[in-house]
Amino acid sequence: MKQRLFLMVSKAKSLCLVGAVLLSIQLGFAAGNEIVVTNNSELTTAINSAKPGDVIVMKDGEWKDVNLSFGSTATEEAPVTLKAQTAGQVILNGNSVLTLTKPNLKVDGLVFKGGAINKGAVINFNSDKCTVSNCAIIDYNPASFDTRYYWIFFSGNYNLLTHCFFKGKNNIEPVLGNAIDNSRHNTVTFCYFKDIPYAKQNGREIMRIWGPGKLGKPSDDGAFFTVEHNLFDHADGEGVEIVSLKSNHNFVRFNTVRASMGAFTNRQGHNNTFEGNFILGENRAGTLGMRVAGENLHVFNNYISNVSDNGLLLMAGEYMDKALTDGFKPGHGNKETLGAPRYCQVRNSVFENNTIIHSGGKGLQLGDAYRKHWPEMQMCLLPEGNTIKNNLIMNCAESNIDVVPVDADPATSFLQFAPNKFEGNVVSGGEVKGADKVSGILKKEVKGSFDKNGLYILKDAKEAKTVGANEYMTNTAECHPLQPNEVGPSWMK
């Protein structure tokens, strides 16, 4: 009887254990060992011997010259995690770097501070389905400005960078970038980019997203990169492009820019989306809104205010079918092959429900850089076939809307452009140039007030729902100006 009772109890315990394991797998957890390491040698051994589900814990303190090649074997159900003993208290310096070399790895709570490297990247996603969270890179700069390296680089797919902090990068190369090939479906979310000093040097974007479409026509392929819920605070870099898309099929949404020099830019690439971003210039010199080139873009529900320069610029494109003059100097090719345009024509895109207030230049311009650097560059393709509707543009210093006219130069007289469609746009307190007789632009004095976030709200409730960036009113949990306590690592709060 006792033996039978023992067997029944043992069987019950086994069933409970199996149930617990199954439940943990269903919830995304996996049982594993916790391995505490205190030096570089122990860290290397732990990484090489870790099993799926294990957690490697780096002891608090300073870690110098750590070549952290994280390549443990893991699975989606049982990732291997590398974490700080106390988030924010493991400080890597010297020439320390982190490279994730196998899939399904997680890194949490590390800080790279005060060190420097001479090439590559401080953190490199060199695999797929990895996550880096709750980490920081602070003042990780070389002695020479010309020493080139990224802080974050993606050369894999389906990776996630979330709730991290970046401050003080002052050398050449963007803070964050990705590989042209084999880098798709990566995401950067809830990160905080602060105090990136200005230096007049091309290639110092805060983010530069390469990939399919960089030099080509629209296609089904692209980088599929998502940049969302990030805060850029005095993040100047090169002072021209904050986020620079140079690939197809990307999403830039629900981000906040505060007093940062430069613009959100669709530099190259097509089928990209800019949604629900807040670009708040705070009247600081060098601030801009958005600048785009390319086809099949969707730019909507963005709020741009108090930038010192232009609000939303639709670029002129470069004509590449043939050389129109002997002075043409193609940028990507030669006079026989011509190659790809330096700027693509803005075509078949939708710009809707954006609010642009108090820009120091133009509010909305169609045809920015038209015939600029002629004849070396053939920037003579004006935007065509676009839909511009339900935008609110107010009190911009140079003009609220500026539609650049076609030049009478015989060299370009053969070009004809499909009309752009204007519908339901409201402008107030500023000029309209080149579109005075265009239907779909209503000039009127609007009434409204500024809410607690400093955002302009129209007094007319019906008009407020249809004109301007209205998503921040209807979906404030998802779309509102971000504050520092909403982004970055938890240990900073």
Give the location of each predicted region.
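Bacterial N-terminal signal peptides
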Residues: L15-Q26
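Boundary at the C-terminal end of the N-terminal hydrophobic targeting segment
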Residues: A30-G32
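Right-handed parallel beta-helix/beta-spiral solenoid domain characteristic of secreted/periplasmic
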Residues: E34-S41, D60-N67, T73-A121, T131, ...
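Glycine- and acidic/polar-rich repeat regions and solenoidal domains
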Residues: N67, G94-T99, K113-C130, I137-A435, ...
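Bacterial N-terminal signal peptides that target proteins for export
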Residues: K2-L17
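Surface beta-loop-beta hairpin patches that serve as ligand-binding interfaces in beta-rich domains
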Residues: G434-K493
